[in-house]
């Protein structure tokens, strides 16, 4: 079974390398999904993730480990179509409700520039209620 690792906002795949190494040493097959919020919209990232999940699902059982925004991307992508659900979803620090810190950070121009639509979504309560609930063991 493959495990897809998805990093958080303003991070890269490097942030999950030690976890990936540990999982591989434990016998798991891993892949990473990467994105850059400064150059992609949330919707574009979600669509790329949806395609990646379709490919993974076509290869057999899979699981997801997602950090922070990666968990929100996962919820959005899995809700787009009738994908085969992962066996397990582990969300590490995913803000499944509006994080107060995002409201303060959004006032700062560098944060707005660096996080784009992804950062803006974190300041909008309607964004969180619009995300589909997902059920996975």
Give residue spans per PLM region.
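Serine-dependent carboxylesterase/thioesterase catalytic core
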Residues: 2-9, 14, 22-36, 40-133
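A conserved mid-domain beta-alpha-beta active-site/ligand-binding segment of alpha/beta enzyme cores
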Residues: 135-137
């Amino acid at each position: 079974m493959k495990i897809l690792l998805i990093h958080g906002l303003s991070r890269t795949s490097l942030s999950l390398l030690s976890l990936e190494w540990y999982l591989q040493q434990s016998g798991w097959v891993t892949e990473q999904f990467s994105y850059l919020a400064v150059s992609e919209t949330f919707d574009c990232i979600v669509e790329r993730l949806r395609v990646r999940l379709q490919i993974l699902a076509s290869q057999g059982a899979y699981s997801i480990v997602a950090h922070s925004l990666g968990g929100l991307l996962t919820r959005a992508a899995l809700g787009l179509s009738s994908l085969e659900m992962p066996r397990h979803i582990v969300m590490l620090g995913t803000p499944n409700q509006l994080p107060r810190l995002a409201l303060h950070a959004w006032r700062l121009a560098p944060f707005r520039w660096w996080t784009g639509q992804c950062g803006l979504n974190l300041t909008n309560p309607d964004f969180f209620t619009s995300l589909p609930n997902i059920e996975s063991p």
